[in-house]
Amino acid sequence: MLAFNFFGATEGGLFDINATLPLMAIQVVALTYILNSLFFKPVGNVVEKREKFVSNNIIEAKNKLSEVKKLEADLLTQLQSARTEAQRIVSEAENESDKLYKEALELANNEANASKEKARLEIESQTSAARDQLSKQADDLSELIVNRLILEK
């Protein structure tokens, strides 16, 4: 057997170089190939798939987040316009109710004034009728007094 003695090593030591060295090299290459094909490639593929999955999920999440922010901004704009519209409607309703109140008040005042005027005219009419009646009674009474005085004389 051919053996090389490195650094004063004896046969059967750690660095024996003999016919088993090529066999060991072949075993290491075969083990590397087997481990690579059976373990490292599948694990690497799983890791790559997982990284792609995670990166796709991150990209999708960013897209959805930007979409949500856009929708939120749109909803805030719609909410603000709805609030403005509601305030406008409330303001119009208040103005309309004020207008109706003023119209009703004016109508009530007009009716009250008309009733008051009617009552005044009726009172004047009754007063005039009472004066006419009183005047007629006074005339009748004075005529009666004159007739009695004339008859007594």
Curated annotation (Swiss-Prot):
Matches recorded under Pfam families: ATP-synt_B
Recorded superkingdom: Bacteria
Locations listed in the record: Cellular thylakoid membrane
Keywords linked to the UniProt accession: ATP synthesis, CF(0), Hydrogen ion transport, Ion transport, Membrane, Thylakoid, Transmembrane, Transmembrane helix, Transport
Membrane topology: Single-pass membrane protein
TM helices/strands, residue ranges: 23-40
GO molecular function: proton-transporting ATP synthase activity, rotational mechanism; proton-transporting ATPase activity, rotational mechanism
Keyword field contains NADP: no
GO cellular component: plasma membrane-derived thylakoid membrane; proton-transporting ATP synthase complex
SUPFAM superfamilies: F1F0 ATP synthase subunit B, membrane domain
Cross-referenced Gene3D superfamilies: F1F0 ATP synthase subunit B, membrane domain
Subunit structure: F-type ATPases have 2 components, F(1) - the catalytic core - and F(0) - the membrane proton channel. F(1) has five subunits: alpha(3), beta(3), gamma(1), delta(1), epsilon(1). F(0) has four main subunits: a(1), b(1), b'(1) and c(10-14). The alpha and beta chains form an alternating ring which encloses part of the gamma chain. F(1) is attached to F(0) by a central stalk formed by the gamma and epsilon chains, while a peripheral stalk is formed by the delta, b and b' chains.
Family: Belongs to the ATPase B chain family.
Protein task: F(1)F(0) ATP synthase produces ATP from ADP in the presence of a proton or sodium gradient. F-type ATPases consist of two structural domains, F(1) containing the extramembraneous catalytic core and F(0) containing the membrane proton channel, linked together by a central stalk and a peripheral stalk. During catalysis, ATP synthesis in the catalytic domain of F(1) is coupled via a rotary mechanism of the central stalk subunits to proton translocation. Component of the F(0) channel, it forms part of the peripheral stalk, linking F(1) to F(0). The b'-subunit is a diverged and duplicated form of b found in plants and photosynthetic bacteria.
PANTHER family linked to this entry: ATP SYNTHASE SUBUNIT B', CHLOROPLASTIC
Protein name per its UniProtKB record: ATP synthase subunit b'
Source species of the chain: Prochlorococcus marinus (strain AS9601)
Name of the coding gene: atpF2
